[in-house]
């Protein structure tokens, strides 16, 4: 935490009558703090700083204490001696230690005294670097980092840190871990609007200052969202780009209310586009809401909600380079020319925008598609819907809504002790699509060679024609039984958690921290009928409870259906010692994790519970300042 000294300038000259104490109230960077409260202790006199931060209070000769308060900043008091002339007192307020605890304690951020390799990207630089890309792309110029947009679908980016993939990079938003509790992966499409709400992003490479039990061997990414602004106002921004890209962002802040105790902030984002790669369209919303309430000098509460309901077409299949350009492939030393020679599997090329995960379809096909994402038929759609585009069908589409709600409490117990806690809920509803049953490709592919033969595309019209004329009298006299369909692979989850950290300053050199990390999650996995592709029903044989097969229609569960619970409890203790040019850091933690699994497609439908897994975590580091510009750490 950067602590900047209060700057006070007093100018006194003699006079006979009541004079004024005047000055400016700014932050440490000299930005005016409009609306700051300026009061004279023990009196009813006071005022509010103007838009330029200026204040003025008339006082009789005497000695007074002037106190300035502003939400999100440390209150400051200064003794003022009034004589016979005006007195000028300028206040430069430092960010509140409680506010910084949201950054440093809950999110475990590193600073210049932490023996950690880190890079922090502020809001202005974030907007400049990122534009409308996925969040990882803002870090692509950071040492030891590789980020890629992969197939080009919105939100399909990934990041590697020091050679480790996202499963080994802890991602946190406002101090709350966001890695999947089952496999550790991070799905950036879930956070499509987080960059618009981000105040800064810090990437800690390798050993991190994070003391939670997170998969952070590669590093840790801390994303801090905008606090509720004390200044009233709004902003509208619109961005456009290739592929019919259009993004509109609206933000509004209420400013201070309720006696300068409450501030609210909100952002809403709408993003649409056809995509550069074929059929990688995007149809997304994003929202962010923040509230800050200063209950008293010792307690502040913050409420955050962020989410990004979205749908987008994907490009997931890897291709031989000759699929895109045979000329480019031929220029590569050592490339096997038989891969695209006449009569071989790459007789044609698809071009750079080629995408195997879609295909054209006749607009005469009016079949509905089923998908669900927190609200059937609601604001974000769901239920039985028309397909995204009447002229084509995506084999691979992602749709998901993962809201995150945090309630933070920051408490100053005394001058040496602070308590920071966050209670959170993270939901999740949506999934990805694919084929199920028999499929048609063009040009036709023999057997299972489809994954080696390219470029080919989907022949949806052939599939629809087959399914539309396929009466199976064993199941129904007149209705058509689909041979192949589109399916949803869905994930629905609810995660609740509590993170609490107590900081105690033992001395000027030593600070200790103890903490608790509790999480519990319930997760459902299944596949559903998305599109019957011209038929009236499909027969599925995956459920042991229906050994003769099960007739399914739009929205019905097929293939598999299981539920998982994850229960997590952990604790830690951490110490940070600073003396002159030396800084030492160390922490130790203990975590216990329990899993349960229930397969609903078994006759027993039994809940299988695994024994708890207990793990120990230990970290340590040291840093030595050689001079003000050079330091070494391990």
Which stretches of residues belong to each language-model region?
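Short acidic/polar hinge/loop motifs at secondary-structure boundaries
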Residues: 56-58, 177-205, 224-225, 333
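Transmembrane beta-barrel wall of Gram-negative outer-membrane proteins
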Residues: 233, 240-272, 277-315, 324-326, ...
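Transmembrane beta-strands of outer-membrane beta-barrel pores
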Residues: 238-244, 254, 270-274, 307-311, ...
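Short, acidic, small-residue-rich periplasmic hinge/interaction motif at the N-terminus
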Residues: 37-41, 69-73, 83-128, 166
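Short, acidic Ser/Thr/Gly-rich low-complexity loop/linker segments typical of extracellular
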Residues: 43-54
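N-terminal periplasmic accessory domains that precede
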Residues: 86-92, 135-138, 157-160, 172, ...
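Signature of Gram-negative outer-membrane beta-barrel scaffolds
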Residues: 485, 511-632
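Extracytoplasmic beta-strand/coil segments of soluble accessory domains associated
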Residues: 136-177, 199
């Amino acid at each position: 935490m950067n602590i900047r000294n209060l700057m006070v300038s007093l100018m006194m000259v003699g006079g006979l009558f009541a004079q004024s104490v005047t000055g400016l109230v700014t932050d440490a960077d000299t930005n005016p703090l409009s609306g700051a409260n300026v009061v004279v202790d023990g009196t009813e006199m006071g005022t509010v700083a103007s838009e330029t931060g200026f204040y003025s209070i008339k006082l009789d000769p005497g000695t007074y204490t002037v106190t300035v308060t502003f939400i999100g900043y440390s209150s400051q008091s200064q003794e003022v001696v009034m004589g016979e002339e005006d007195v000028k007192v300028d206040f430069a307020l430092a960010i509140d230690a409680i506010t910084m605890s949201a950054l440093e304690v809950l999110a475990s951020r590193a600073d210049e005294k932490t023996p950690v390799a880190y890079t922090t990207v502020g809001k202005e630089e974030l907007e400049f670097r990122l534009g409308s890309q996925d969040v990882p792309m803002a870090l692509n110029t950071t040492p030891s980092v590789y980020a890629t947009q992969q197939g080009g679908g919105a939100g399909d980016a990934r990041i590697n840190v020091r050679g480790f993939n996202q499963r080994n990079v802890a991602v946190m938003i406002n101090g709350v871990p966001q890695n999947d509790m089952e496999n550790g992966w991070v799905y950036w499409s879930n956070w499509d609007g987080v960059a618009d709400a981000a105040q800064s992003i810090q990437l800690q490479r390798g050993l991190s200052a994070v003391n939670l039990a997170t998969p952070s061997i590669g590093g840790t990414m801390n994303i801090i969202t905008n606090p509720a602004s004390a200044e009233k106002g709004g902003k509208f921004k619109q961005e456009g780009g290739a592929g019919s890209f259009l993004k509109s962002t609206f933000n509004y802040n209420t400013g201070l209310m309720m006696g300068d105790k409450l501030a609210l902030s909100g952002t809403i984002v709408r993003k649409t586009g056809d995509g550069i790669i074929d059929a990688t369209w995007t149809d997304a919303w994003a929202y962010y809401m923040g509230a800050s309430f200063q209950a008293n000098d010792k307690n502040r509460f913050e409420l955050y909600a962020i989410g990004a309901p979205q749908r987008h077409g994907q490009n997931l299949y890897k291709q031989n380079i000759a699929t895109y350009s045979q000329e480019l492939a031929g220029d590569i030393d050592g490339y096997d020319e038989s891969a695209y020679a006449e009569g071989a599997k790459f007789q044609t090329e698809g071009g750079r925008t080629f995408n195997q995960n879609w295909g054209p379809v006749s607009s005469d096909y009016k079949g509905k598609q089923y998908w669900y994402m927190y609200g059937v038929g609601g604001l974000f759609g769901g239920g039985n819907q028309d397909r995204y585009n009447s002229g084509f069908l995506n084999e691979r589409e992602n749709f998901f809504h993962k809201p995150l709600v945090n309630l933070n409490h920051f408490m100053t117990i005394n001058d040496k002790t602070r308590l920071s806690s966050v209670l959170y809920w993270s939901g999740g509803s949506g999934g990805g699509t694919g084929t199920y049953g028999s499929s048609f490709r063009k040009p036709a592919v023999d057997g299972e060679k489809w994954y080696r033969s390219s470029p080919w595309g989907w022949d949806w019209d052939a599939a629809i024609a087959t399914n539309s004329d396929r009466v199976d009298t064993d199941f129904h006299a007149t209705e058509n039984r689909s041979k192949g369909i589109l399916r949803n692979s869905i994930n629905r989850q609810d995660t609740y958690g509590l993170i609490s950290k107590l900081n105690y300053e033992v001395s000027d050199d030593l600070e200790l921290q103890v903490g608790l990390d509790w999480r519990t999650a319930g997760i459902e996995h299944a596949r559903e009928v998305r599109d019957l592709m011209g038929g009236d029903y499909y027969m599925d044989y995956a459920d042991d409870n229906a050994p003769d097969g099960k007739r399914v229609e739009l929205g019905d569960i097929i293939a598999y259906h299981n539920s998982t619970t994850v229960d997590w409890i952990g604790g830690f203790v951490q110490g940070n010692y600073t003396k002159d040019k030396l800084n030492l850091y160390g922490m130790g933690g203990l975590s216990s994790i329990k899993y349960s699994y229930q397969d609903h497609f078994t006759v027993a439908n039994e809940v299988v519970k695994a024994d708890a897994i207990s793990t120990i975590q230990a970290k340590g580091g040291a840093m030595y300042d050689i001079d003000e510009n050079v330091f070494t750490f391990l």
